[in-house]
Amino acid sequence: MGVMAPRGSSITNTEFELRGFNHLALVARDMKETVAWYEDVLGMKLVKTMELPGGRGQHFFLDMGNGVDGIAFFWFADAPEGEPGTSLQGPNGMSAIGTMNHLAFDVPAEKFDEYREKLKAKGVKVTMAINHSDSLNGGHKPDYDAATDGGDVFVRSIYFKDPNGTTLEFACWTKTFGPEDLQHEPATAKGTPVTA
């Protein structure tokens, strides 16, 4: 079984040559506002626009800044509003089955704190740094120091929302995962772990 690890690791998919995400397609309430926010706040660049047949809406593509990864947005003339806890992440962090809970962007660990301050300076409401800790079962460890952590914190995260209410995350891996990180059986639809 493969594991997630910091960029540049040697994990290989031998089944398919998946090179990353081509794009992720989301739905915008207001295309103009959405494009402006992603360009002005996150620095992405609009690279492709199209009108959908029959006046149904629009489909726009933004490049994340590396010429490869992108985010696309649909705008539909009669799209229903998102529902927290169903199509959007609810106040308790849950969302419905088959929906996207949040979108995490990989950022350099050495720029993590700087990027949080940069978002705040742009008027974005950002959470405190969440240091996901093994010793706290994924819970938050309030203080993080790479020199003294000893591998307890596995990812650092900050969360914020785009104009459509989509929860976004800036995340940086702080350790490479190994076999010791695979300690839980997956739950079934009934909430019980699968037995071997």
Across the structure, where does each feature detected by a protein language model lie?
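A detector for short, charged/polar N-terminal pre-domain segments
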Residues: A5-F16
